[in-house]
């Protein structure tokens, strides 16, 4: 083969290789385009199902090792349309209480970053339920948890997290600087009320969707305080009760009507022989019912009911099944304050059904231990101590604490009635458990159902002391 033939042969081979390579590249491009078309079609199909992808990323230190955790969840999208919560439904008929949530925050906090808290409560919008709580500006098992038995300090803040989750810096939302608080949703936005400042001049800061809208200055200069549970929204107006004055004698009690964070009306209760603190309130057929704590002289609970014009009625739960702590043994009740063991108290709640009442209370008469729900079919109006149903939720041997009511509106549940629910604070640490340097709590919650329920104990369950306590 002469040199020219060699050149022609080599050129032909190179051209053939080039053509083959070009064909392969064109095939690759076509393959990628087809694959992309299939994926795009699949994504469009997913969009029809109205789903969204949410990625949670959490970075932390574990035993001096940096760990980055990424968790991608595909969840069905919800209709986030705003609506006014009517609040005009009656309470759902119920036979008992089903466990709804348990956050186990003290157990988790022995090894994880969990806030030191107290006064947790739950409130629901038409889309979700959230746990609100008052932090101490500290984490469990950390040096700043020392001395957190104190109720009022400049480090306390109202925060919230998804219900059932342990409150941590990674899942919690700041709401307000506060050592006393309330919150509720009107269907369009969250109203938060946070009280902070000195005992003789505290100020309540009202926020609507996170923006300050109003302030209320202490009018008696004696520890302005509010509910430590959810406020109530009816037809676009939200209602809350505040107390200012002595905790062991007559004080001043005011109801506030609030629209989009602005106060539109307020009244002072004429109740010289009653004592209202830390009220647990709920809507029922367009009115608001509040069951409160008498820290002055009643071992039964006071109540106040009012309409949207703030026309009100007051009284005490008449049942001989007493709801406060401390309290005497069940016996003869009264529609006025029951003075036996009437001093001091604990935040609590009840639900009225006509002449009957569901009473939530500690199982112990003298300490914040255990918790039970009792159905007294005539307890709202009659003074005997007969009851039909008792459901245990925390055993006598386990710590409890504050408790309060919250409701789930029909706009959330799809029911044609207002579902009654409650939460129980499970306090751990000081002052009762002196092996610790801190005070905090976890929480459980239950909702009323017209089906089978169970007696059991859902305690906090943390093993104390922690490393920081030793």
Swiss-Prot record:
Catalysed conversion reaction: Hydrolysis of alpha-(2->3)-, alpha-(2->6)-, alpha-(2->8)- glycosidic linkages of terminal sialic acid residues in oligosaccharides, glycoproteins, glycolipids, colominic acid and synthetic substrates
Regulation acting on activity, per entry: Inhibited by the neuraminidase inhibitors zanamivir (Relenza) and oseltamivir (Tamiflu). These drugs interfere with the release of progeny virus from infected cells and are effective against all influenza strains. Resistance to neuraminidase inhibitors is quite rare.
Enzyme class per UniProt: hydrolase
Entry PTM: N-glycosylated.
Cofactor needs: Ca(2+)
Major site of localization recorded for this protein: virion
Residue numbers spanned by region Involved in apical transport and lipid raft association: 11-33
Record topological domains on the Intravirion side: 1-6
Region of interest (Hypervariable stalk region), residue spans: 36-90
Segments on the Virion surface face: 28-470
Residues that, per the record, bind substrate: 118, 152, 277-278, 293, 368
Alphabetized UniProt keyword annotations: Calcium, Disulfide bond, Glycoprotein, Glycosidase, Host cell membrane, Host membrane, Hydrolase, Membrane, Metal-binding, Signal-anchor, Transmembrane, Transmembrane helix, Virion
Cellular compartments annotated: Virion membrane; Host apical cell membrane
Molecular function as annotated in GO: exo-alpha-sialidase activity; metal ion binding
Protein family (similarity comment): Belongs to the glycosyl hydrolase 34 family.
Note: The influenza A genome consist of 8 RNA segments. Genetic variation of hemagglutinin and/or neuraminidase genes results in the emergence of new influenza strains. The mechanism of variation can be the result of point mutations or the result of genetic reassortment between segments of two different strains.
Self-association state and partner proteins as the record states: Homotetramer.
Name the UniProt record assigns to this protein: Neuraminidase
Gene: NA
């Amino acid at each position: 083969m002469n040199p020219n033939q060699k050149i022609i042969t080599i050129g032909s081979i190179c051209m053939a290789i080039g053509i083959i390579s070009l064909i392969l590249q064109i095939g690759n491009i076509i393959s990628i385009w087809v694959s992309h078309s299939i994926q795009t079609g699949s994504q469009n199909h997913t969009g029809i199902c109205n789903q969204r992808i949410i990625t949670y990323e959490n970075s932390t230190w574990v035993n001096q090792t940096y760990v980055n955790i990424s968790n991608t969840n595909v969840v069905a999208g919800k209709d986030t349309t705003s609506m006014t919560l009517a609040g005009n439904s009656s309470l759902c008929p119920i036979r008992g209480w089903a466990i709804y949530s348990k956050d186990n925050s003290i157990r988790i906090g022995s090894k994880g970053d969990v806030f030191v808290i107290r006064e947790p409560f739950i409130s629901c919008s038409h889309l979700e339920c959230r746990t609100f709580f008052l932090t101490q500006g500290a984490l469990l098992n950390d040096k700043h948890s020392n001395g957190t038995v104190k109720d009022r300090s400049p480090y306390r803040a109202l925060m919230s997290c998804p219900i059932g989750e342990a409150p941590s810096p990674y899942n919690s939302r700041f709401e307000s600087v506060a050592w006393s608080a309330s919150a509720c949703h009107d269907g369009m936005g969250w109203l938060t009320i946070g009280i902070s400042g000195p005992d003789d001049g505290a100020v309540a800061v009202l926020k609507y969707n996170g923006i300050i809208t109003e302030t209320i200055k202490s009018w008696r200069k004696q520890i302005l305080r509010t509910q430590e549970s959810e406020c109530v929204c009816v037809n676009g107006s939200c209602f809350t009760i505040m107390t200012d004055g002595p905790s062991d004698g007559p004080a001043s009690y005011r109801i506030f009507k609030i629209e989009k964070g602005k106060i539109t009306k307020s009244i002072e209760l004429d109740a010289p022989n009653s004592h209202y603190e830390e009220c647990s309130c709920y809507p029922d057929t367009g009115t608001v019912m509040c069951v409160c704590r008498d820290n002055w002289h009643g071992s039964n609970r006071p109540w106040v009911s009012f309409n949207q014009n703030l026309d009100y009625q007051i009284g005490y739960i008449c049942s001989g099944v007493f709801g406060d702590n401390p309290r005497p043994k069940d016996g003869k009740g009264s529609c006025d304050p029951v003075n036996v063991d009437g001093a001091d108290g604990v935040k609590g709640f009840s639900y009225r059904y006509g002449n009957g009442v569901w009473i939530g209370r500690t199982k112990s008469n003298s300490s914040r231990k255990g918790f039970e729900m009792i159905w007294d079919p005539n307890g709202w109006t009659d003074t005997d101590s007969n009851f039909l149903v008792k459901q245990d939720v925390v055993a006598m041997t386990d710590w409890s604490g504050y408790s309060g009511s919250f409701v789930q509106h029909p706009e959330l549940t799809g029911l044609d009635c207002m579902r009654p629910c409650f939460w129980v604070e499970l306090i751990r640490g000081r002052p009762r458990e002196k092996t610790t340097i801190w005070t905090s709590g976890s929480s459980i919650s239950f909702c009323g159902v017209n089906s089978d329920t169970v007696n059991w104990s859902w305690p906090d369950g943390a093993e104390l002391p922690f490393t920081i306590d030793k």
